[in-house]
Every structure is written in structure tokens, then in C-alpha cells.
UniProtKB/Swiss-Prot annotation:
One of its GO terms (cellular component) is plasma membrane. It is found in: Cell inner membrane. Belongs to the PlsY family. One of its GO terms (molecular function) is acyl-phosphate glycerol-3-phosphate acyltransferase activity. Probably interacts with PlsX. It is a multi-pass membrane protein. The chain crosses the membrane at residues 4-24, 70-90, 110-130, 158-178. The keyword Nucleotide-binding does not apply. Keywords: Cell inner membrane, Cell membrane, Lipid biosynthesis, Lipid metabolism, Membrane, Phospholipid biosynthesis, Phospholipid metabolism, Transferase, Transmembrane, Transmembrane helix. The lineage of its organism: Bacteria, Bacillati, Cyanobacteriota, Cyanophyceae, Synechococcales. Pathway: Lipid metabolism; phospholipid metabolism. GO terms for biological process: phospholipid biosynthetic process. This is Glycerol-3-phosphate acyltransferase.
Amino acid sequence: MLTALLAVLGGYLLGSIPTGYWVGRWWGGIDIRQQGSGSTGATNVLRTLGKGPALLVLLVDAAKGAAAVALGSALGSAWWVVLAALFAVIGHSRSCWLGFRGGKSVATSLGILLAMAWPVALTTFGVWLLGLALTRIVSFSSLLAAVAAPVVMWATAQPLPYLLFALAGGVYVIGAHRRNIERLLAGSEPRIGQKWTQSP
């Protein structure tokens, strides 16, 4: 019971670190939640503050995911890895420090996959890059990657706990993109380089 609690709380607190919010405050003197899409993730930071801050957010958010995997590994089981990882994903998008708001958990999920099964991470990232090259729409690319991750986990015969994480995490990330999906269907989702014209 104590081990499960450590995995849940540790994973959640790692994921909840509000990287995008802090970078917005320190780098640009802004509240990123009131800019662009209102997300604290790297894509909204890119649109609002530029490449340098966005790269910093991307790297730190991915590191949060990798740290959650390390925590679960230290607890001694692949199931604890999955539990800590899932709660890191939740923590990123529902940060207790930001009124349970946050990002879409894409970078955090990438960090988790890199630490969990790097061939899966690289293949999934390749799918993301392909989607971006074809459409220049980050959200569409992220949705493709969320679908691809469990398929690649299965195709590469990864352990069952990791496959279940990819399934659950993929569904969660897709759910976090529901407003993006609405805009994609309406043809109003911005592409890379386009300014955000809607309210957060």
C-alpha cells in the first residue's frame, strides 16, 4: 500500500511541476495560461515566446516523465513504473499548482517512453515528425503519436505493463486534445507559424 502511494504521489508531483508557467513568468513576464491556447505546454510557449523557451519547456517536461519512470523502477516493479508514469501524465495536465490546469502531457509522455522503451519512443516520435511534416499541425501530429505508441509497444513485444501504459496514456492524451479535435474538424486549428486568434 505504501509503495503504491509513493508511486502515485511521486509520479503526480513530478508531473505537476509547472514548467511552462514558470518559463512564461521568468522569460516573458506573462501568465502562459492567459496566452494563446491557454496550455502550459511547449507548443503554446513556442507560439507565445519563441523557440528557446519552448525547447526548455519541452526538455524539462520530458525529464519529468523520465524521472517518474526512474521512481517506479526504484520501487521495484514494472507495475510501479506504470503507476508513477500514469500519474505523471495526469499531473502535467492537472497540476495542483495551477488550479488543476496544465498542458496536454505530450512531452511528458515522450520522456516516459524514452525511459521505458526507447525504440518505441523513437518510432513514435518519428510518427509525430511525419504528421508534422505533412500537416504542420502539432495537435494532429500528437494525436497520431498517441495512436501509434500502443501499436509500436505491441509490435515490438514490450512487457504487458508498458503496453497497458501506452494504451491508457494514449487515450488520456487524446482526451486532453478534445478541443483541438473540435478545431481540426472545423478546419480552424492553427498550423506552425500561424498566430493564435482565439481566446484561451
